[in-house]
UniProtKB/Swiss-Prot annotation:
The gene is nadD. Pathway: Cofactor biosynthesis; NAD(+) biosynthesis; deamido-NAD(+) from nicotinate D-ribonucleotide: step 1/1. Its EC number is 2.7.7.18. Disulfide bonds: none annotated. This is Probable nicotinate-nucleotide adenylyltransferase. It comes from Legionella pneumophila (strain Lens).
Length: 211
């Protein structure tokens, strides 16, 4: 069975944490296809700061050394806000016989009940939750705990060989980097070079982004 991983985010900007997390995931799971999915206008997050075109360009630059990582722009190509359930339905229509795995952070899992038609997500894809030990101190909503009790399975072969319906928690390493923090540091003219791929850093400086 062909296995597909989908890593969604605003990538505003894409940073070394995104890349290192993805490399760790692939080293452990080895999905046949791995897509970075830039969101257009997330329904439960503020609007992005860079344009869609700029965010895609930064992704292209960041992924140049990693030809196995692809970019999927279907959310940007839609005229409607980014609802993950619609995106996964689109993937499922295109890849009817593949396993689909959506990669989310542990915070994303806790906020899952806020997602539009969130109950349908597990029927469309598996969930690979990037967990970190410090997050386990946060209270888990009852609806999410019920979901974990029913669908959690940390056997990686399940994700690779089942169309949907499993939740796997995986520690991909701790990287104290966030796009929000990088934007704030750039606005304060602080050095962020070590947190960004070189080509992305050069692009941000050239475009004078996040000033």
């Amino acid at each position: 069975m062909h296995s597909i991983a989908i890593f969604g985010g605003t990538f505003d900007p894409v940073h070394n944490g995104h890349i290192k997390t993805s490399l760790a995931i692939q080293a452990n799971f080895g999905f046949d296809s791995y897509y970075f999915l830039p969101c257009k206008s997330p329904a439960i997050k503020p609007p992005s700061f860079a344009s869609s075109e700029q965010r895609v360009e930064m992704l292209k630059l960041a992924l140049k050394p990693y030809p196995d990582f692809k970019i999927d722009t279907r959310e940007l190509d839609r005229d409607t806000p980014s609802y993950m359930v619609y995106t996964l339905q689109s993937f499922r229509q295109e890849y009817t016989d593949s396993s689909l795995t959506l990669i989310i952070g542990y915070d994303g899992l806790l906020n899952l009940p806020q997602w539009y038609q969130w109950e349908k997500i597990i029927s469309l894809a598996n969930l690979l939750v990037i967990n970190r030990e410090e997050f386990f101190q946060k209270p888990v909503p009852k609806s999410v705990q019920t979901l974990l009790n029913q669908y959690r399975n940390d056997d990686k072969n399940i994700l690779l060989n089942h169309h949907a319906g499993s939740i796997c928690l995986y520690n991909a390493g701790h990287y104290d980097i966030s796009s929000t923090k990088i934007r704030e540091q750039l606005k304060q003219h602080k050095d962020v070079k070590n947190n960004l791929p070189d080509l992305v850093y050069d692009y941000i400086k050239k475009q004078e982004l996040y000033q």
